[in-house]
Amino acid sequence: MTDKKVIRLRRARKARLKMHELEVVRLCVFRSSQHIYAQVISADGSKVLASASTLDKDLRDGATGNIDAATKVGKLVAERAKAAGVSQVAFDRSGFKYHGRVKALADAAREGGLEF
């Protein structure tokens, strides 16, 4: 693995350990060069309560790797989380910088009713 990826994974591991100690539901984000994925994971980490990505049929038609697509994913995951009875989450950015697509997804999820 490259140093950049190793450093990102180390940041992610440290953040996830803190969230695990607090035992909170988390909104986990992963971004690739072409897509972005979001999952709401239970406090013990054993179950995915809600998920959304640019691979969903609703979102696949438009562009999938830009800020607009991330905003749509954020709104969709917030709707699905609220339907599952989740309103408060911890934001797990998976070691990615809070910038660009990751920030757009977080802002849209907040607008959709999730509290971080």
Curated annotation (Swiss-Prot):
One of its GO terms (biological process) is translation. One of its GO terms (cellular component) is cytosolic large ribosomal subunit. The keyword Magnesium does not apply. The keyword Ribonucleoprotein applies. CDD domains: Ribosomal_L18_L5e (cd00432). Part of the 50S ribosomal subunit; part of the 5S rRNA/L5/L18/L25 subcomplex. Contacts the 5S and 23S rRNAs. This is Large ribosomal subunit protein uL18. It comes from Pseudomonas putida (strain ATCC 47054 / DSM 6125 / CFBP 8728 / NCIMB 11950 / KT2440).
